[in-house]
């Protein structure tokens, strides 16, 4: 840990040393509480998709650090708030999902957390709670009388999630306007039912978190704290968790462990040390050694990052297979059964498929236009040979050992397999 840390609790000292802290309410009071017995803290996740992607990983790791420091994490699933939709950072209303879709998404998301947290009934075991349990029980008039009285419209209009939409003259529904009240009530309910004293989240959630802290302190006169992490972007300014080919999902059903490994292997040089601190359990002295690597040696640090991140999300065996497949593909030029595959109807391949379309469909390019630009830059390969014509037809004649090997640049590979 950093000797200059202003914190005394293991939890906050760890967060500070690894770069998780952006803002904290009542910092000294929280630090004192974290030095005592286990504290209970939560982060909320709305169920807008059947999995979570890397953009949510810093929050998942925050819960992991909490548990590692001897405290109790609550994963709050937004079965109720997802019905409304968080307007934070959005230029338009989210699509409203059916109850069945929300529950299906929650089921998919649950599998992600079991890889990072230990669940159970013990004092520091994680639990998962759905806010639909209490939000769905409120009558409209009851909700307004109990909680609406504690919020002024003047203040609600001042929050960025509202103010920015209005300044851009983009509509915000009354449904969305209520989201911040619902999130504040979540904290109060968790405090009452589970003794939860801390809500954590990204810095874009600061206003919503403050509402919950203040509501809990005002209504029940109980201790309540908030903590946010920095919004994460790569050194080049790209949004964390997205690539040209789409979201970097945390479950194997939507993104293969191989592609997940490759995502971390492709980390920009300037981000390696920061990501090792945030997304792995490696000790800080080992991370310092890896950060000190220069030139081509930095690639070894990237492989360690990829190994550690993939091991955490997919297990030891899948991480090993992903690295072995990468080494075979890039260092030995061989085919590997562990490389991602894209299945295509044999009849379609017999008739011929436009290469640019195949690249887009296989997830190697975000669009046909991007595939054409790759070809023009020499970054599009078919069976290890550069292909300048992205409009040429790929047919059964291109099969080698039963597959067509497509590559975008040096690191993204898919085997096209007829079925």
Curated annotation (Swiss-Prot):
Places the protein is found: Cytoplasm
Motif ('KMSKS' region): 239-243
Record-linked InterPro entries: aa-tRNA-synth_Ic, Rossmann-like_a/b/a_fold, S4_RNA-bd_sf, Tyr-tRNA-ligase, Tyr-tRNA-ligase_bac-type, Tyr-tRNA-ligase_bac_1
Residues holding ATP: 242
EC number: 6.1.1.1
Main localization of the protein described in the UniProt heading: cytoplasm
UniProt KW Cytoplasm keyword: yes
Coiled-coil annotated spans: none
Highest taxon listed in the record's lineage: Bacteria
Segment forming the signal sequence: none
UniProt xrefs under HAMAP family: Tyr_tRNA_synth_type1
Subunit structure: Homodimer.
Function recorded in the entry: Catalyzes the attachment of tyrosine to tRNA(Tyr) in a two-step reaction: tyrosine is first activated by ATP to form Tyr-AMP and then transferred to the acceptor end of tRNA(Tyr).
Family: Belongs to the class-I aminoacyl-tRNA synthetase family. TyrS type 1 subfamily.
The name this protein goes by in its record: Tyrosine--tRNA ligase
This protein's encoding gene: tyrS
